[in-house]
Amino acid sequence: MKRAGLLLLGMLAAVPAWAADLTVSAASSLTESFRELGAAYEKAHPGTKVDFNFAASGVLLQQISRGAPVDVFASADETTMDQAQQQDLLAAGTREVFAVNALWVVAPPQAKATPRTLKDLAGAGVQRIALGNPDSVPVGRYAKGALEAAGLWPSVQGRIITTQNVRQSLDYVARGEVDAGFVYATDAQAMPDRVRRAFAVPVPGRIAYPLAVTKASTQPVEARRFAAFVRSPQGQAILARHGFGKP
Protein backbone atom coordinates (compact mmCIF):
# COMPACT_ATOMS: atom_id res chain seq x y z
CA MET A 1 0.00 0.00 0.00
CA LYS A 2 2.85 2.30 0.93
CA ARG A 3 4.60 1.54 -2.38
CA ALA A 4 1.38 2.30 -4.26
CA GLY A 5 1.11 5.64 -2.47
CA LEU A 6 4.70 6.53 -3.31
CA LEU A 7 4.13 5.50 -6.91
CA LEU A 8 1.06 7.74 -7.12
CA LEU A 9 3.01 10.66 -5.68
CA GLY A 10 5.74 10.06 -8.24
CA MET A 11 3.23 10.05 -11.06
CA LEU A 12 1.67 13.29 -9.83
CA ALA A 13 5.09 14.88 -9.56
CA ALA A 14 5.75 14.02 -13.20
CA VAL A 15 2.64 15.92 -14.32
CA PRO A 16 3.33 19.64 -14.95
CA ALA A 17 1.57 21.71 -12.31
CA TRP A 18 0.81 25.12 -13.74
CA ALA A 19 0.86 27.80 -11.07
CA ALA A 20 -1.16 30.04 -13.35
CA ASP A 21 -2.93 29.67 -16.66
CA LEU A 22 -3.19 32.93 -18.60
CA THR A 23 -5.58 33.46 -21.47
CA VAL A 24 -4.51 36.18 -23.88
CA SER A 25 -6.85 37.39 -26.62
CA ALA A 26 -4.79 39.10 -29.31
CA ALA A 27 -5.35 40.54 -32.78
CA SER A 28 -4.67 38.18 -35.69
CA SER A 29 -1.68 40.24 -36.82
CA LEU A 30 0.06 39.37 -33.53
CA THR A 31 -0.05 35.61 -34.09
CA GLU A 32 3.63 34.81 -34.69
CA SER A 33 5.06 37.48 -32.40
CA PHE A 34 2.81 36.65 -29.45
CA ARG A 35 3.42 32.93 -29.77
CA GLU A 36 7.13 33.65 -29.46
CA LEU A 37 6.45 36.04 -26.58
CA GLY A 38 4.39 33.37 -24.83
CA ALA A 39 7.14 30.77 -25.15
CA ALA A 40 9.73 33.22 -23.82
CA TYR A 41 7.46 34.19 -20.93
CA GLU A 42 6.81 30.58 -19.95
CA LYS A 43 10.56 29.93 -19.99
CA ALA A 44 11.19 32.94 -17.76
CA HIS A 45 8.29 32.04 -15.43
CA PRO A 46 8.20 28.25 -14.91
CA GLY A 47 4.78 27.08 -13.82
CA THR A 48 2.87 29.59 -15.92
CA LYS A 49 1.10 28.54 -19.11
CA VAL A 50 -0.04 31.12 -21.66
CA ASP A 51 -2.96 30.23 -23.92
CA PHE A 52 -3.75 32.43 -26.92
CA ASN A 53 -6.92 33.26 -28.79
CA PHE A 54 -6.26 35.08 -32.07
CA ALA A 55 -9.00 36.79 -34.06
CA ALA A 56 -10.09 40.19 -35.36
CA SER A 57 -9.96 42.79 -32.59
CA GLY A 58 -13.69 43.51 -32.84
CA VAL A 59 -14.53 39.82 -32.56
CA LEU A 60 -12.32 39.50 -29.48
CA LEU A 61 -14.06 42.48 -27.89
CA GLN A 62 -17.45 40.86 -28.47
CA GLN A 63 -16.22 37.66 -26.83
CA ILE A 64 -14.91 39.52 -23.78
CA SER A 65 -18.09 41.57 -23.43
CA ARG A 66 -20.11 38.33 -23.45
CA GLY A 67 -18.10 36.90 -20.58
CA ALA A 68 -15.34 34.91 -22.27
CA PRO A 69 -12.58 34.16 -19.72
CA VAL A 70 -9.75 36.43 -20.83
CA ASP A 71 -6.90 37.84 -18.75
CA VAL A 72 -5.13 40.08 -21.28
CA PHE A 73 -6.52 41.82 -24.36
CA ALA A 74 -4.25 43.09 -27.15
CA SER A 75 -5.93 45.04 -29.94
CA ALA A 76 -4.68 46.18 -33.34
CA ASP A 77 -6.17 49.63 -32.84
CA GLU A 78 -7.06 52.22 -30.24
CA THR A 79 -10.72 52.39 -31.31
CA THR A 80 -11.51 48.84 -30.22
CA MET A 81 -9.69 49.33 -26.93
CA ASP A 82 -11.63 52.57 -26.41
CA GLN A 83 -14.83 50.55 -26.78
CA ALA A 84 -13.58 48.01 -24.24
CA GLN A 85 -12.83 50.84 -21.83
CA GLN A 86 -16.25 52.41 -22.37
CA GLN A 87 -17.83 49.05 -21.53
CA ASP A 88 -15.79 48.94 -18.30
CA LEU A 89 -14.03 45.72 -19.33
CA LEU A 90 -10.47 46.81 -18.49
CA ALA A 91 -8.60 46.88 -15.21
CA ALA A 92 -7.83 50.46 -14.25
CA GLY A 93 -4.36 51.73 -15.11
CA THR A 94 -3.31 48.74 -17.22
CA ARG A 95 -3.93 50.05 -20.73
CA GLU A 96 -0.77 50.92 -22.65
CA VAL A 97 0.40 51.00 -26.28
CA PHE A 98 3.14 48.41 -26.79
CA ALA A 99 3.80 48.49 -30.56
CA VAL A 100 3.07 50.28 -33.83
CA ASN A 101 2.57 48.97 -37.35
CA ALA A 102 2.14 50.21 -40.93
CA LEU A 103 -0.49 49.64 -43.62
CA TRP A 104 0.49 48.07 -46.94
CA VAL A 105 -1.10 46.88 -50.13
CA VAL A 106 0.25 43.50 -51.24
CA ALA A 107 -0.23 41.55 -54.45
CA PRO A 108 0.35 37.96 -55.59
CA PRO A 109 3.91 37.38 -56.87
CA GLN A 110 2.50 36.08 -60.16
CA ALA A 111 0.40 39.20 -60.78
CA LYS A 112 0.90 40.62 -64.28
CA ALA A 113 0.62 44.19 -63.03
CA THR A 114 1.36 45.21 -59.45
CA PRO A 115 -0.49 48.33 -58.24
CA ARG A 116 1.80 51.12 -57.10
CA THR A 117 -0.71 53.67 -55.81
CA LEU A 118 -4.20 53.70 -54.35
CA LYS A 119 -5.44 55.08 -57.67
CA ASP A 120 -4.19 51.92 -59.40
CA LEU A 121 -6.69 49.90 -57.36
CA ALA A 122 -9.46 51.54 -59.39
CA GLY A 123 -7.79 50.57 -62.68
CA ALA A 124 -8.66 47.75 -65.05
CA GLY A 125 -5.82 45.55 -63.79
CA VAL A 126 -7.35 45.15 -60.33
CA GLN A 127 -10.74 43.46 -60.07
CA ARG A 128 -10.70 41.86 -56.60
CA ILE A 129 -9.34 43.50 -53.45
CA ALA A 130 -9.17 41.74 -50.07
CA LEU A 131 -10.09 44.05 -47.22
CA GLY A 132 -10.99 43.22 -43.62
CA ASN A 133 -14.55 44.00 -42.55
CA PRO A 134 -14.35 47.66 -41.43
CA ASP A 135 -16.98 46.99 -38.76
CA SER A 136 -14.78 44.57 -36.82
CA VAL A 137 -11.30 44.47 -38.37
CA PRO A 138 -9.01 47.44 -37.65
CA VAL A 139 -6.97 47.04 -40.85
CA GLY A 140 -10.23 47.29 -42.76
CA ARG A 141 -11.08 50.56 -41.04
CA TYR A 142 -7.64 51.98 -41.81
CA ALA A 143 -7.90 50.87 -45.45
CA LYS A 144 -11.42 52.19 -45.96
CA GLY A 145 -10.41 55.50 -44.37
CA ALA A 146 -7.43 55.82 -46.72
CA LEU A 147 -9.58 55.06 -49.76
CA GLU A 148 -12.25 57.53 -48.65
CA ALA A 149 -9.63 60.22 -48.05
CA ALA A 150 -8.33 59.66 -51.59
CA GLY A 151 -11.87 59.84 -53.00
CA LEU A 152 -11.59 56.27 -54.30
CA TRP A 153 -14.01 54.33 -52.12
CA PRO A 154 -16.98 54.58 -54.55
CA SER A 155 -14.75 53.38 -57.40
CA VAL A 156 -13.40 50.30 -55.60
CA GLN A 157 -16.27 49.36 -53.30
CA GLY A 158 -17.67 46.88 -55.81
CA ARG A 159 -14.29 45.12 -56.01
CA ILE A 160 -13.94 44.53 -52.29
CA ILE A 161 -13.80 40.96 -51.02
CA THR A 162 -14.60 41.33 -47.32
CA THR A 163 -12.56 39.17 -44.94
CA GLN A 164 -12.96 38.21 -41.29
CA ASN A 165 -9.44 39.26 -40.30
CA VAL A 166 -6.17 40.46 -41.76
CA ARG A 167 -4.74 36.95 -42.05
CA GLN A 168 -7.61 35.90 -44.29
CA SER A 169 -6.80 38.85 -46.56
CA LEU A 170 -3.17 37.77 -46.60
CA ASP A 171 -4.13 34.18 -47.45
CA TYR A 172 -6.36 35.30 -50.33
CA VAL A 173 -3.46 37.26 -51.81
CA ALA A 174 -0.98 34.42 -51.27
CA ARG A 175 -3.28 31.99 -53.07
CA GLY A 176 -3.84 34.41 -55.94
CA GLU A 177 -7.59 34.59 -55.29
CA VAL A 178 -7.51 38.40 -55.34
CA ASP A 179 -5.44 40.96 -57.23
CA ALA A 180 -4.48 42.95 -54.15
CA GLY A 181 -5.11 43.14 -50.43
CA PHE A 182 -4.69 45.49 -47.49
CA VAL A 183 -2.53 44.06 -44.69
CA TYR A 184 -0.09 45.26 -42.08
CA ALA A 185 3.63 45.45 -42.75
CA THR A 186 4.16 42.65 -40.23
CA ASP A 187 1.75 40.37 -42.10
CA ALA A 188 3.58 40.95 -45.38
CA GLN A 189 6.83 40.11 -43.58
CA ALA A 190 5.32 36.81 -42.40
CA MET A 191 4.93 35.60 -46.02
CA PRO A 192 7.80 37.20 -47.96
CA ASP A 193 7.86 34.45 -50.61
CA ARG A 194 4.11 34.28 -51.15
CA VAL A 195 3.08 37.93 -51.40
CA ARG A 196 4.67 40.96 -53.02
CA ARG A 197 4.74 44.28 -51.22
CA ALA A 198 3.18 46.77 -53.60
CA PHE A 199 3.20 50.06 -51.66
CA ALA A 200 2.79 51.59 -48.23
CA VAL A 201 -0.49 53.35 -47.51
CA PRO A 202 -0.33 56.60 -45.52
CA VAL A 203 -2.80 56.85 -42.65
CA PRO A 204 -3.49 59.77 -40.32
CA GLY A 205 -1.82 59.37 -36.96
CA ARG A 206 -0.27 56.01 -36.16
CA ILE A 207 -1.38 52.40 -36.18
CA ALA A 208 -1.01 51.70 -32.48
CA TYR A 209 -1.44 48.40 -30.66
CA PRO A 210 -2.73 48.78 -27.09
CA LEU A 211 -2.78 46.06 -24.46
CA ALA A 212 -4.67 45.86 -21.16
CA VAL A 213 -5.53 43.47 -18.36
CA THR A 214 -9.23 42.67 -18.28
CA LYS A 215 -11.31 43.61 -15.27
CA ALA A 216 -12.62 40.04 -15.02
CA SER A 217 -9.17 38.41 -15.06
CA THR A 218 -8.83 35.54 -12.60
CA GLN A 219 -5.03 35.97 -12.66
CA PRO A 220 -4.60 39.76 -12.35
CA VAL A 221 -1.09 39.66 -10.89
CA GLU A 222 0.20 37.24 -13.53
CA ALA A 223 -1.64 39.17 -16.24
CA ARG A 224 0.08 42.41 -15.23
CA ARG A 225 3.40 40.58 -15.20
CA PHE A 226 2.82 39.32 -18.75
CA ALA A 227 1.83 42.82 -19.92
CA ALA A 228 5.04 44.19 -18.40
CA PHE A 229 7.02 41.46 -20.18
CA VAL A 230 5.55 42.50 -23.55
CA ARG A 231 6.77 46.05 -22.90
CA SER A 232 10.17 44.94 -21.56
CA PRO A 233 13.36 45.13 -23.66
CA GLN A 234 13.15 41.37 -24.30
CA GLY A 235 9.52 41.62 -25.36
CA GLN A 236 10.18 44.61 -27.59
CA ALA A 237 13.09 42.78 -29.23
CA ILE A 238 10.78 39.88 -30.11
CA LEU A 239 8.20 42.26 -31.55
CA ALA A 240 10.90 44.06 -33.56
CA ARG A 241 12.01 40.77 -35.13
CA HIS A 242 8.48 40.41 -36.46
CA GLY A 243 8.45 43.91 -37.93
CA PHE A 244 6.70 45.92 -35.21
CA GLY A 245 7.95 49.35 -34.23
CA LYS A 246 8.31 50.79 -30.76
CA PRO A 247 5.48 53.07 -29.62
Task: Label each PLM-derived region with a short phrase.
Residues A4-P16:
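Bacterial N-terminal signal peptides
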Residues A19-H45, K49-G58, Q62-R66, S75-E78, ...:
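Exported/periplasmic ABC-transporter solute-binding proteins
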